[in-house]
């Protein structure tokens, strides 16, 4: 916010030439709802950038396809002294479900364009257990495979323990913006020019995550993401420097200048 507002202050104070500019801040990005109710016609822009990336000089226009899955296991509790061939321990079935997923497709074992299953939460007892996953992949077909795999595991366990033992609910979250950015690649080309004018080398890597720009792009507002200059996001060591924030503001001003010509 500070980088964007500082750029706006400089434009107003110095009277720099610019076209129509639209500025907005979305409050719920970190829970995946930042752009779900965003009023694109009311916003009034044809193209946009989000400022939500990593190191200053970064341009992100390819991100994960994303889904979330909730796995619910229904057990059958009886006295453990007479449980043989009768008890279905929901917590054990939950561990069996998770154990059926590939170990090398977890966040801690993947990088680059490799997708993953991420177990975010789990809890349970003998009668009921729940697993919460997020699924990620840059390739939409590979994400679909991951979703199908969860259903196949559920089918196998239901065949083993009885129908209805395992239920899987899957909800799509966001999609890779690349398809929507390609027809408007001037956004990337002009961002490159703006970064180079600021004395930096553009860095373009697929995002191992998502941004509101992905949702906005699929809703009709092409919107790549720019670096903020921050580090160690989503942790107690998250930080940035004033110098990097100044550079991020300089890049925004350069973009405005490029589009004003």
Features from the language model and the residues they span:
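Short, hydrophobic beta-strand segments
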Residues: 73, 129-137, 170-177
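Zn-dependent metallopeptidase/amidohydrolase metal-coordination segment
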Residues: 125-127, 202-251, 256-259
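A glycine-rich, aromatic-flanked flexible loop/lid motif
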Residues: 67, 119-132, 153, 157-169, ...
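Alpha-helical metal-binding/catalytic segments enriched in His/Glu/Asp
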Residues: 1-29, 69-73, 79-80, 84-104, ...
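Structural motif
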Residues: 21-22, 45-49, 69-70, 203, ...
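Acidic/histidine-rich catalytic neighborhood of metal-dependent amide-processing enzymes
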Residues: 1-64, 106, 110, 114-120, ...
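Acidic-enriched catalytic cores of C-N bond-cleaving enzymes acting on peptides and small amides
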Residues: 61, 83-121, 141-167
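Active-site-adjacent substrate-binding region
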Residues: 92-109, 116-118, 165, 175-223
């Amino acid at each position: 916010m500070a980088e964007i507002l500082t750029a706006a202050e400089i434009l107003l104070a110095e009277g720099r030439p610019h076209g129509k500019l639209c500025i907005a801040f979305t409050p719920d990005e970190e829970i995946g709802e930042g752009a779900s109710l965003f009023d694109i016609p009311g916003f009034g822009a044809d193209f946009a950038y989000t400022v939500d990336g990593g190191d200053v000089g970064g341009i992100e226009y390819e991100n994960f396809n994303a889904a979330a899955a909730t796995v619910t296991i229904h057990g059958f509790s009886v006295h453990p002294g007479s449980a043989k061939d009768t008890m279905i321990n929901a917590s054990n079935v939950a561990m069996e479900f998770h154990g059926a997923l590939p170990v090398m497709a977890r966040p801690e074992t993947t990088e680059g364009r490799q997708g993953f299953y991420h177990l975010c939460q789990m809890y349970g007892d003998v009668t009921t257990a729940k697993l919460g996953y997020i699924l990620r992949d840059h390739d939409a077909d590979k994400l679909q495979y991951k979703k199908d795999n969860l259903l196949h595991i559920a089918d196998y366990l239901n065949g083993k323990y009885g129908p209805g033992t395992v239920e899987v609910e899957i909800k799509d979250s966001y999609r890779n913006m690349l398809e929507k950015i390609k027809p408007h690649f001037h956004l990337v080309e002009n961002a490159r020019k703006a970064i180079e004018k600021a004395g930096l080398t553009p860095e373009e890597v697929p995002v191992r995550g998502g941004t509101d720009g992905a949702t906005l792009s699929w809703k009709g507002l092409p919107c790549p993401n720019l670096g903020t200059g921050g580090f160690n996001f989503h942790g107690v060591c998250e930080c940035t420097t004033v110098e990097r924030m100044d550079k991020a503001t300089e890049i925004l001003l350069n973009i405005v200048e490029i589009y004003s010509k």
